C-alpha cells in the first residue's frame, strides 16, 4: 500500500470515584438535572480552594500499572489556560510538566499480528462542563446552554505514541482499553455516556516518496465504530489531497455522524497556546514505595492473563478465551457455569453464540439478564437425557433468556419433549418409503443424500420432536435392509 496512516490517540477516561476531583460534589452526574451537582470549587468561585481526591490518585496508579507504565513518585498539577463557555475558572487543572506516569504500552491484536502500542504519558485532570446545543450540533444550533455538572469530574488522559497503523487498530486499542478499565473497576468505560472519549491525531505517509502530510486531530467520536469510520474517512480525504499534490490544513475536525464525514472546527492549537504553569493551590503528589506496593496488590487478574488461564485450565482455543475474557462479567459468568456444568467447551460455544446474540440484540450486559448457570445445567440435562435435541434447545433459548423460566418448564408447557419411540419413528419412515419409491431407488443407486428426505419427512410429521440421531439410524437401517 503506497499510503500509510500514522495514528496516535488521546483518550480521556472518566473515573468512577464517589466525588469529584477537587471537591465533595458527586462525580456520577450523567443523569442529574443540569447544574445540580456544583459548588464554589468546581464552578471557580473566588476564594474556593481545591482538595485532591485520594481515590482519583489510586485509580490513576492502578490504571498506569495495568498499562505497564513507569509510575512517578513525584507528580504535580498545572493550570491549562483557555477560554470556553463551559470552563468557569478560565483554566483546567491538569498535569503537564510532571505527569503521574509515562512510558507504558498496551498489546493489541494488530493488522499483522500481536503488536505493542506505546503509551507516552498518563496524567490526571478535571473535566470541563458541557454545552447543550439547541439543534443537536454546534454548527446547526441557534443557541447553546451550559451545564456545569461535569466541571471537576476526575479524568485520566492517556496519550499514545503514533504507533497505530490503521483505523481498525485504533478501534481495537480502544476496545482493549475499555476492557481493562472495567476489569480494574476504575471506570464504566461507556462511550455513549462520555465515560470514555477519544481524540485521534492522524497523518499520512507516502511510502514511495517519504512525504508526510500535516497532522489532523479528529474529535466527537462517541462509539468504537465511529472511531474507525471517522479515521477511515479522514485517511481517504488526506490521501486524495496528497494525490492532487496538495497538503491538508493542520486543524481540528469533528466527526459528523449524520453525514458520515469530518468537518473543520478550528485551527490546531499549539501547547504554548495553553500557557501552562504550576497550580499554586495544590501541593505535589508524592507516592511512597509502600503505597505503590499496596495498590499493586489490589490489581485483579487482567484480560490477557485471564485468557491465558482459560486456555490452560479449560483447554479452550485462543479465540474462545479472548471473547469470553473481553468482558469481566462475561468471564465471571462462564466460570460460574463451569462450576455447575463441567463442560467448558460446550458452555463456551453456547455463550459465544446464543448468549452474545441475545445480549447484543438488547444492548445489555450479562449481569442485567435473567440468565443463571442453573439454566444451562437444566438445558444440558434435557439434551443429555435425550428429552430435547440441540435444535429444540436453541429454539427455546430466547424464551429462557427473556423470561428466566427453566428450560424444562418451557419444554413441558410447549409439549416439546423429544420422541424416542423407535416403533413410531420406524412406522413413519416406512410410510415415507411407501409414498416415495423414487427416493428409495435414488438411495440404492448411490445417491446417499436421498436419506435426508426421509429424515425430513419424520421431522415434519412429528413437528421437529423426533430424536434426529435415532431417526437417522432407523432411516439407514431400513434403506440398507430394503
Swiss-Prot record:
Its EC number is 6.3.5.-. Pfam families: GatB_N, GatB_Yqey. The keyword Coiled coil does not apply. The keyword Calcium does not apply. Keywords: ATP-binding, Ligase, Nucleotide-binding, Protein biosynthesis. It catalyses: L-glutamyl-tRNA(Gln) + L-glutamine + ATP + H2O = L-glutaminyl-tRNA(Gln) + L-glutamate + ADP + phosphate + H(+); L-aspartyl-tRNA(Asn) + L-glutamine + ATP + H2O = L-asparaginyl-tRNA(Asn) + L-glutamate + ADP + phosphate + 2 H(+). GO terms for molecular function: asparaginyl-tRNA synthase (glutamine-hydrolyzing) activity; ATP binding; glutaminyl-tRNA synthase (glutamine-hydrolyzing) activity. GO terms for biological process: glutaminyl-tRNAGln biosynthesis via transamidation; translation. Heterotrimer of A, B and C subunits. Belongs to the GatB/GatE family. GatB subfamily. Allows the formation of correctly charged Asn-tRNA(Asn) or Gln-tRNA(Gln) through the transamidation of misacylated Asp-tRNA(Asn) or Glu-tRNA(Gln) in organisms which lack either or both of asparaginyl-tRNA or glutaminyl-tRNA synthetases. The reaction takes place in the presence of glutamine and ATP through an activated phospho-Asp-tRNA(Asn) or phospho-Glu-tRNA(Gln). This is Aspartyl/glutamyl-tRNA(Asn/Gln) amidotransferase subunit B. It comes from Thermotoga neapolitana (strain ATCC 49049 / DSM 4359 / NBRC 107923 / NS-E). The gene is gatB.
Amino acid at each position: 500500500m503506497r499510503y500509510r496512516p500514522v495514528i496516535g490517540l488521546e483518550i480521556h477516561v472518566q473515573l468512577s470515584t464517589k466525588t469529584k476531583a477537587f471537591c465533595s460534589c458527586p462525580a456520577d452526574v450523567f443523569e442529574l438535572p443540569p447544574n445540580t451537582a456544583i459548588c464554589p470549587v468546581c464552578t471557580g468561585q473566588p476564594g474556593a480552594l481545591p482538595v485532591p481526591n485520594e481515590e482519583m490518585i489510586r485509580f490513576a496508579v492502578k490504571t498506569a500499572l495495568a498499562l505497564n507504565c513507569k509510575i512517578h513518585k513525584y507528580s504535580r498539577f498545572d493550570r491549562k489556560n483557555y477560554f470556553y463557555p463551559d470552563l468557569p475558572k478560565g483554566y483546567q487543572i491538569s498535569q503537564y510538566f510532571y505527569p503521574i506516569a509515562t512510558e507504558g504500552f498496551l498489546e493489541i491484536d494488530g493488522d499483522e499480528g500481536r503488536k505493542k502500542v506505546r503509551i507516552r504519558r498518563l496524567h490526571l485532570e478535571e473535566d470541563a462542563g458541557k454545552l447543550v446545543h439547541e439543534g443537536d450540533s454546534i454548527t446547526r444550533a441557534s443557541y447553546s446552554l451550559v451545564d456545569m455538572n461535569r466541571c471537576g469530574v476526575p479524568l485520566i488522559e492517556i496519550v499514545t505514541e503514533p504507533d497505530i497503523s490503521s483505523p481498525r487498530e485504533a478501534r481495537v486499542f480502544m476496545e482493549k482499553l475499555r476492557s481493562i478499565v472495567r476489569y480494574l473497576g476504575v471506570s464504566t468505560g461507556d462511550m455513549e455516556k462520555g465515560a470514555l472519549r477519544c481524540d485521534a491525531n492522524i497523518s499520512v505517509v507516502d511510502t514511495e516518496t517519504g512525504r508526510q502530510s500535516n497532522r489532523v486531530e479528529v474529535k466527537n467520536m462517541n462509539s468504537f465504530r465511529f472511531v474507525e469510520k471517522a479515521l477511515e474517512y479522514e485517511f481517504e480525504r488526506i490521501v486524495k489531497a496528497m494525490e492532487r499534490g496538495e497538503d491538508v490544513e493542520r486543524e481540528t475536525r469533528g466527526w459528523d455522524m449524520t453525514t458520515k464525514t469530518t468537518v473543520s472546527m478550528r485551527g490546531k492549537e499549539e501547547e504554548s497556546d495553553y500557557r501552562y504553569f504550576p497550580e499554586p493551590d495544590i501541593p505535589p503528589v508524592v507516592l511512597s514505595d509502600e503505597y505503590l506496593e499496596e495498590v499493586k496488590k489490589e490489581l485483579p487478574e487482567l484480560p490477557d492473563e485471564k485468557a491465558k488461564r482459560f486456555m490452560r485450565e479449560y483447554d479452550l482455543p485462543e479465540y474462545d478465551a479472548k471473547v469470553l475474557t473481553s468482558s469481566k462479567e462475561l468471564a465471571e459468568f462462564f466460570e460460574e457455569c463451569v462450576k455447575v456444568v463441567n463442560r467448558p467447551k460446550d458452555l463456551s460455544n453456547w455463550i459465544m453464540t446464543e448468549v452474545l446474540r441475545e445480549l447484543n440484540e438488547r444492548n445489555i450486559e450479562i449481569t442485567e439478564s435473567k440468565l443463571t448457570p442453573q439454566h444451562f445445567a437444566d438445558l444440558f440435562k434435557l439434551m443429555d437425557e435425550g428429552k430435547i435435541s440441540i435444535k429444540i434447545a436453541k429454539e427455546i433459548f430466547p424464551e429462557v433468556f427473556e423470561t428466566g423460566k427453566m428450560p424444562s418448564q418451557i419444554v413441558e408447557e410447549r409439549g416439546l419433549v423429544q420422541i424416542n419411540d423407535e416403533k413410531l419413528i420406524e412406522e413413519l419412515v416406512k410410510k415415507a418409503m411407501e409414498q416415495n419409491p423414487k427416493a428409495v431407488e435414488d438411495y440404492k443407486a448411490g445417491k446417499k443424500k436421498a436419506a435426508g428426505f426421509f429424515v425430513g419427512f419424520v421431522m415434519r410429521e412429528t413437528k421437529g420432536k423426533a430424536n434426529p440421531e435415532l431417526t437417522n439410524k432407523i432411516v439407514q437401517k431400513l434403506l440398507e435392509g430394503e
